[in-house]
Amino acid sequence: MSTFASSSASAAGSQSSASTASLRDCVKSKILDQVFASAEAKSSSWMVLIMCDRALRVVNSVVGMYDIMERRITTVEQLKRKRQPLPELDGVYLVDPSQQSIDQILADFSNPKKPMYNNVHLFFLTPVSDAQMTKIKKAKLLLSKIKTFSEINIDFLALEANSFHLDMNSCFKELVCRTPNSMAHKVIAAQLVTVCATLNEYPHIRFKQSSSICCDIAQSFHEQMVS
């Protein structure tokens, strides 16, 4: 058994351990406060919530429709589907920062005469890459409408009070039948980092040294935590 640790790990862990909130409560609070309440505070109109498939699963694991409607959100729509323009309402996007999601958001504001929504609040599950950020910066109409831009660091499903699911259907196959170009361990590590960010934890990392899979995930997780 091996361990990665940082000098700040114990201090951060002791501070967060005082909290009695469950993981599920932390995720729910983060979504309600950092996403919906934040957008509501900057919007004078009713809002439309637009989510990609992954964001929809993340939200559905902790938040009900009543919670959403309480925040002046009148409609919930899927990003990938054809949607009716509602230029009198503000759009709240909660999506993963994939190329597909970014391209769809840009398409919503590609026609200056027919913008999909009024003002825009952009919330991303994970950090936006430099390449995707550059594409957003070049979209002048979209830029003029952005009132919120935030990366909330939630990339897992909080299905129970203190357990979570990474929602990776092909994970086992990719890890066991790994090719030299496989990124599975880095993706898993990145998702685990969002769990720690949600809990405000900086953990000690213990792993089975004889397992190359465990070593790779532990090393990647450690690197992303300290970066």
Regions found by a protein language model. Give the residues of each.
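Extended, well-folded catalytic/binding cores that form a central cleft or groove in large enzyme
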Residues: M1-S227
